[in-house]
Amino acid sequence: RELKGRVIVADPTTDLALVKIEGDDFPAMPIGDSDKLKVGEWVLAVGNPFNLGSTVTAGIVSAKARGLGANGVESFIQTDAAINQGNSGGALVNVKGELVGINSVLSSPTGAYAGYGFAIPTSIMTKVVADLKQYGTVQRALLGIKGASLGSSIMEDQSPIDKSGTTLRDKAKEFGVVDGVWVREIVDNGSAAGADIKVDDVIVGLD
């Protein structure tokens, strides 16, 4: 059957929304715990690729907590189940029939499926939905700094970070630390500014 839906509120960062549908007796897919997924576990991707309705493809979980810099999500489920144009918003389901992710993006130089698909895990989805219901927007933490990682690997890094030719290795030696985050910029009205963190501070731990 076909029913009309009305968007109540949406989160543009994750491209998720609350949609109200008038009707009753709707079957509901059980929501699984995406945190319990294991790499190599079988999953099914359901969607509408190329207007081929209710298409199901199968694959495995290729990786977890994959960061792409896309959609503001840094914890995608990566799968080789075919995800193409039109799959976005469809279900990623485990072998128990539980929803474990929302199909989101594919990674391909041509725009067609190349073996790399990504889904937003239910651990993020449930948080987004709860916040949209309660606040009408998603509550996100913002540290309020722009920084650079200081670690053992940068001791070999000779890339200049400013016009004077200073490198991260130079900075690490200057600070006398081998692990931490060097604060390069403070965002106005952010949490860091309110906590009196300054440019050139080095964050070495969190309470």
Describe the residue ranges of each PLM region:
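Conserved catalytic motifs of ABC-family nucleotide-binding domains
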Residues: 200
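Conserved "HGTGT" condensation-loop signature of ketosynthase/thiolase-family condensing enzymes
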Residues: 203
